[in-house]
Amino acid sequence: MASTEPERENREDETEVNEDEDTGAQVAPIVRLEEVAVTTGEEDEDAVLDLKSKMYRFDKEGNQWKERGAGTVKLLKHKETGKVRLVMRQSKTLKICANHLISSGMSVQEHSGNEKSCLWHATDFSDGELKDELFCIRFASIENCKTFMEKFTEIAESQQVGKESTQGDEAAGLIENLSVEENISEEKAKEAEEKEPAKEDKETKKEKVEEEKKTEAST
């Protein structure tokens, strides 16, 4: 008696082929994902400086330096206001290590004993609240450190000039207002002087009339 096993295997193979066959039907996804615009907050700023580095902050309680992360430090200038801020993010997690404005009066100095590092004080906002921090940053080369320090100092000085110009404009405005007020006061004084003789003439005429009346009464 012939075995029917091969025929059975053939039928199973055909069934598997039919199950795997592409019918061409389109299957709609269960969840539709929409594109989300990702913003970094740097869209309205131009990068003045962009360097690889490692940043530290001084822990006052522990009296020691603590690493904030390694990544790229940027000096970003706002396209409208002209203000410059320092921003650094960790290279892998993109967590913010530092985020503060460079304002007039700020200074940066070389770390003693290490020409590749420098430090400065700043009012930082990287943790979501303003804090006075002492930062130290280390670069791969002395040249990069010098470039950073020179640019930092240049920006701080330019902010000082801008501040003085603003104060100068405000002072000029006050002087101009003062001059206008003085002119108005002078005009009022002249008007008062012009009115004064007329008033005196009226009083003189009045006195003459009274004297004439007295003379007539006595006669």
Curated annotation (Swiss-Prot):
In Pfam terms, one family for this protein is Ran_BP1
- Taxonomically, which superkingdom? Eukaryota
Carries keyword Iron? no
Principal place where this protein is found? Answer: nucleus
Tell me where it resides.
Nucleus, Nuclear pore complex
Q: Which UniProt keywords apply?
A: mRNA transport, Nuclear pore complex, Nucleus, Protein transport, Translocation, Transport
Where composition is biased (Acidic residues), the residues are 12-23
One GO cellular component this record assigns the protein to is:
plastid
* Native organism taxonomy: Eukaryota, Viridiplantae, Streptophyta, Embryophyta, Tracheophyta
Organism, scientific name: Arabidopsis thaliana
Q: What is this protein called?
A: Ran-binding protein 1 homolog c
